[in-house]
Amino acid sequence: DGTAYLEEYNFKLLPGTGPYVIKDEDIVNQESYTVTKRDSWWREDHRTQMYMYNFDKVTISVVKDNPALQFEKLKKGEADAIVIRKPSIWVDETDFEAANKGWVQKRRVHSSVPAGTWGYAFNMRKWPFDDKRVRYAFSYLYDREKFNSEILYNEYALQNSLYSGSEYENQNNNKFEFNPSKAVELLKEAGYKVRNDRGYLVHEETNKELSFTIEVGKPAEYRVTPMQQILKEYGIDMQIKFVDPTTRWKNLMDRNFTIDFQGWGGLVYPNPETSFKSSLADQKNNNNVSGLKSERLDELLPIYDTEFDHARRVEIIQEIDGIVSDIHPSAWGLSREPPARLLYWDKFGYPDYMLTKYGGRFEDILYHWWFDTEKDKALQNAMKNNGSLPLGETEHTFWKDQ
């Protein structure tokens, strides 16, 4: 069953040929791990790797499901750089002494990384989301504009496609704007017309209460609780159960879930087969998490994979996007990747673009930045004398300006 393998190797790095190694003694279970650059890397002088991997040693702290703790470690100098994923921290809490004096720099780095999205994935294999009308009703009760303005500080954009903002987006997709009247109408069509003494809708034939459970990590609580409250107002009981990421992922891959709050990363070149091929729908451990099946999609997928004309490929993906939107295996929410929000102590050098065009991720720091001795001296001097350093522009728009 793999238990012996996991016990032996779960916290060991298998041999590889990359620029860094992780030594067994540099792994502190559940706390940190340190990568050390090889003395002589075989690909170091290759033209595609020049000026990369500039740090001799990097320690990565492990902070699970606690963005506030991650932020505090940065403020105390226990971390040199972090990405801020929670909008409220970025907007309300980054006005601290080190940031105001320029010791810690604050950047929103724009890139061309495909946005992706996050939202609610339905398990269409089982009740109640095996009924398309219930899936649609859920989406009509998903007040994304309100969530964005009141909870997410308008840091995100509404998504109505797997490929929002790109040429692949099907502009005819249903926008699913907040429409409680439409939701109630659909629920009645699905058989949910009256409420029980708890105030929740029950099916007219089975008398089954419209109630289900969503499993999330604690950091997602502030995003799903408002949805729970709206659903309750309209007679739907969504129970929230907090689980660790490992448990949630196992249940998702085993298809042991009813609804899941998740994110979908964007791709420069779409690869829909791994998520929507019908033969994957009833198998475990793949990306067709909702159990989507469509004969037309199965016809289009091999055509797309063997088509070399770009314009035609775009047409195919747009049709696929429309089919998926209509079947509605997920209630798409808001863009998953706004500009990267970075905080870092001002001791680093970096290329003009800061983060790569189609990566735009925190990990780019490890690949492309370097330790700047002169900057570090200036930082230490400013901290010693309670001085200030130049703040720099918060909005970093190198790729947008090209």
Each PLM stretch: what is its role?
Residues 16, 51-56, 132, 177-213:
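Immediate post-signal peptide segment of exported/extracytoplasmic ligand-binding proteins
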Residues 18-23, 31-34, 55-62, 208-217, ...:
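Short, well-ordered beta-strand elements
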Residues 23-36, 61-126, 137, 145, ...:
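Extracellular/periplasmic solute-recognition and catalytic clefts
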Residues 26, 30-33, 116-118, 137-175, ...:
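Detector for C-terminal structural segments
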Residues 56, 78-80, 104, 130-135, ...:
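Loop/turn elements at helix/coil->beta-strand transitions in domains of secreted/extracellular proteins
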